[in-house]
C-alpha cells in the first residue's frame, strides 16, 4: 500500500494523525503531503523535533558499562601498569576518585564505585544540559533533528482519490463532467528565477552621473588615455616639481616608456609654464596676458616634466582641453570662452588601501569656463549637481590646491557611518595655470572633482569600499543592485 493511501485510510477514522504513525522516512512523507495539500485533500503542519540519541559507542557503554568502570573491575582482580591503560579511561577514573597511583601502579582508592556514565546514558532524556555536553565530548551521544508532521483532513478530502486533470486538450475539453477535477491555478508559487548578465552598480551610477551632466548642459571629454606626461598631469596645473604628491609614494611612474617626448605640447607653451614656475627670467610671448605671480621660485626641469605616469586625476585631460580652447580663441575673430565640460574615468594613486581608499578609483570632474564666474556660482553648481544625485547634506571646507584658489573640499554625510566623508575638491583655476595657456584675464574657470565610489557607498549603505569594488564582491550583490540609484 502506498504512503498516500495509508494517510487517507488513517484520516478516514481519525481527525488528526502524526507522521510517527506512518512507518516511512520523513523525506518520502513530505513529497506526498505536498501533492495532497496542493489538491486541498489534506492540511499539515511541521513540528521540528530535536532528539537526544546514543551513538554506536554510547549504545555499547549502555550495554556493557563504561571503560572507567570496567577498569575498576579489572583492578579488583590485579594491579595494572599505567602504560597499559587508555588515557581517556584513566582521566575519568581519576576524575571520579576511584583510583590513585602507588609505586607506578594503579590501585583502588577505596571510595564507593558506581557507573555514573552508564546511568546517565540509560536516563538520557532527563539529564542536564551540562551532563549531556560532557557525554557528547566523549562521542557517546549526539543530537538528531527531524520533522514531525501533524496531518488533518482538507476541504476536498475523500478516501478514494480521482485523478486530477492537469491540462486541457482537444480530447477532454468538451468531455469533462466534474469540473472539480480540474487542477486549480496556484498564484502563490514563487517565481522561477532567470539569471542574466548584470551591470556592476558602478557602471549604472556612472550612467546616471553622465545623464545628470548632460541635463545640466555639459559636454563629455575624451579620457581614453590612462598614461600621461608629468607635464600635463602636474606642470600645466601649476603644481610645483617638489610637491609631495609627485613622489613615488603617491604616484605610479612608468618604467617603459619612462619618458614622454612632449610632441603634443607647443614649445612656446612649455617656455611660458617654465617661466611661471621658475625664478629665472624667460621672455613671455607677445599677445598673451602677463601673469605677475612670483611663481614657485625654484628651478623648473623639463626632464621632470617628461616622466610618464599613470594619471593621478582627470584634470590632466581638463588642462589639455582648456589649452585647446584658449589656442582656438587666439586665432578666432569672434571669441567664445564659454564652455561646460565633464569626464568620468579611472585615476590611479599610490595609496594605502583601507575602508574608504583604493589605489585605483573613478574620478568625476566638471568645469565651467566663462566671464563673471566666482565662488558663488561654483557652490551653486555643486549643490545643484548633488541635489540631482539626491544627496542633500553637503558641506564645504576651505582647502589648498596648487592649481585652484580659492579651493574647497566637499563633504557628504554618510548615514550608516554617521559621519561626514570627503567626496571631492573644488575651486577656481589659478591665473598661473590659465594665462600661460592664452586665456585673457577676464575669463574664469570653476571646477570640481569627486570620487564616483564615495557617493555610491552612501547610496548603497556600504561601510567598506572593498565591498563595492574588487574580487571579493558577490555576483548576487551585482545582480540584486537597483536599476536606478539616485532617485531615493
Swiss-Prot record:
Gene3D superfamilies: 1.10.10.2320, 1.10.10.2330, 3.30.1370.240, Bira Bifunctional Protein, Domain 2
Classification via InterPro entries: aa-tRNA-synth_II, aa-tRNA-synth_II/BPL/LPL, Phe-tRNA-synth_IIc_asu, Phenylalanyl-tRNA_Synthase
PROSITE patterns linked to this entry: AA_TRNA_LIGASE_II
Region annotation (Contains the major tRNA-Phe binding sites) ranges: 1-146
Residues the entry annotates as binding Mg(2+): 405
Protein's name according to its UniProt entry: Probable phenylalanine--tRNA ligase alpha subunit
Family, per entry: Belongs to the class-II aminoacyl-tRNA synthetase family. Phe-tRNA synthetase alpha subunit type 2 subfamily.
GO-annotated biological processes: phenylalanyl-tRNA aminoacylation
This enzyme's EC code(s): 6.1.1.20
Cofactors that this protein relies on: Mg(2+)
Pfam family, one: tRNA-synt_2d
Catalytic activity: tRNA(Phe) + L-phenylalanine + ATP = L-phenylalanyl-tRNA(Phe) + AMP + diphosphate + H(+)
Keywords from the named record: Aminoacyl-tRNA synthetase, ATP-binding, Cytoplasm, Ligase, Magnesium, Metal-binding, Nucleotide-binding, Protein biosynthesis
EC top class, as a word: ligase
